[in-house]
From Swiss-Prot:
Induction: Circadian-regulation. Expression is higher during the late light phase than during the dark phase.
Record note on disruption phenotype: Late flowering.
Swiss-Prot/TrEMBL Kelch repeat ranges: 304-354, 357-404, 409-457, 462-513, 523-571
Domain PAS stretches: 44-123
Gene Ontology biological process terms in this record: circadian rhythm; flower development; negative regulation of cellulose biosynthetic process; positive regulation of flower development; protein ubiquitination; regulation of DNA-templated transcription; regulation of gene expression; response to blue light
Tissue and organ expression note: Highly expressed in stomata and leaves and to a lower extent in seeds, roots, rosettes, stems and siliques. Also present in sepals and anther filaments.
Full protein name: Adagio protein 3
Family matches, as PANTHER family: ADAGIO PROTEIN 3, BACTERIOOPSIN TRANSCRIPTIONAL ACTIVATOR
Gene name of this polypeptide: ADO3
Organism listed in the record: Arabidopsis thaliana
Amino acid sequence: MAREHAIGEATGKRKKRGRVEEAEEYCNDGIEEQVEDEKLPLEVGMFYYPMTPPSFIVSDALEPDFPLIYVNRVFEVFTGYRADEVLGRNCRFLQYRDPRAQRRHPLVDPVVVSEIRRCLEEGIEFQGELLNFRKDGTPLVNRLRLAPIRDDDGTITHVIGIQVFSETTIDLDRVSYPVFKHKQQLDQTSECLFPSGSPRFKEHHEDFCGILQLSDEVLAHNILSRLTPRDVASIGSACRRLRQLTKNESVRKMVCQNAWGKEITGTLEIMTKKLRWGRLARELTTLEAVCWRKFTVGGIVQPSRCNFSACAVGNRLVLFGGEGVNMQPLDDTFVLNLDAECPEWQRVRVTSSPPGRWGHTLSCLNGSWLVVFGGCGRQGLLNDVFVLDLDAKHPTWKEVAGGTPPLPRSWHSSCTIEGSKLVVSGGCTDAGVLLSDTFLLDLTTDKPTWKEIPTSWAPPSRLGHSLSVFGRTKILMFGGLANSGHLKLRSGEAYTIDLEDEEPRWRELECSAFPGVVVPPPRLDHVAVSMPCGRVIIFGGSIAGLHSPSQLFLIDPAEEKPSWRILNVPGKPPKLAWGHSTCVVGGTRVLVLGGHTGEEWILNELHELCLASRQDSDL
């Protein structure tokens, strides 16, 4: 009675009864809709089953641990718990087979529990199935929907749960992770290894059992999710329980998402339908499946050109501008849809285009936006910005004002961070002066404005270098034609910067300098590929001497002591590869556009560096 009085008083003080009534109305609306839908055909696996009355619960989202403040009569009938036994408690007690149990039953799926927790933390709706138990221990399947309820200010005040219970027949004596058949076996094994009276027995017993006493939810959500895919694979070899847990596809996806970021894992989602997350993570970590292949596509890109810029938008390659005959700046846009049965280049019809240019950059933001910056036009160098939404019904190039822009330039480098911010670095002015500045433009704001990134020191001015993103906001700069005293020389140095720092600063990447360690030869206009795991692959470009531009070099800039290593790849690589004409598609495909004969580019011929297994047929 005291608990009920305290709960009632608290809800009265914060005027929450009105919200509960709203929640009940929400539930009643659901019943009415359900009755209306009874005549509709139901498929196996659908969420609602009209023959089973739904249970409704409401929890307080403003209190820690989401305590229950309301359950309906159906809940009491199906679970065997009275309202006064459960109000003020988190509803996880339904995962316990016995009311006195201290942890949930091992057959309850920890991944579903983790997903529920994530949805509650992010304030989004959840739908799924979960094993529950009646008060007497009878197993139930709970088809559950959780929906947040917000107040006028948008604050989540309550969470309503709609539950459809059905009895299930499962073998409760079977555990999901059979680490040991009996605890006695563990005791006997420990006794054999270490006498029970020795200090080693106690040390071994505590160390061995400590982590296994954690629930699967804690292991998955709080421990495994914080590790790299490589570390998770190693942990999976420790015992059968951890092996089963690390083999769970949802756990593997959660590990990859936390290690690589939501944007990258979202891009890789289509690959997991063929390879699944475990194999994909292994192949991207070990690079065991990497290979070159060559294919041709249809269509025509006319007029012929060089010095164009290309990028990937989903599974589409986009080409803009370039240098035509007699150094004519071109302003057309072409797209190649790799999902098509017979991919072919097609011109994008637009009402107006940005001024023609070459030596510019073309980037993809927000999944479907194309962003053009700078380059050399008819009247000299440019510093304008144009955006086109490729998914729009009628794609249109629109100029972005951007406040005070950077100096006009060409042969600069650009990249995108956090999916929506354009970063521009270096390049060359009309007078031939090399630049060392770095600018950022956030195109998601109402009035995008260029912002220069102030640093106490910057790498030598350069053009033709590469910018590669790793760790979400960190950038690796490599190569280019850089100032070296009074000379301009190809560079082989690498630098990093973290734009999330309060005071970002450039740092030269200090690589291991052991005898015999390989380093990429100095180069410019090369290819730099950012892998999902944060490593960077360098190849191609303009190189002096007898070095092969097709040799691949790999580095992990996040390592404490980074070192370059050569990546030997089977297959026939392209003879030449340039950064402005190479795209990364889906995180696992590096496409090099065309070879060329003299001044003529062959854009119907593509070389692909496959970072993961391809299970479809060649194009």
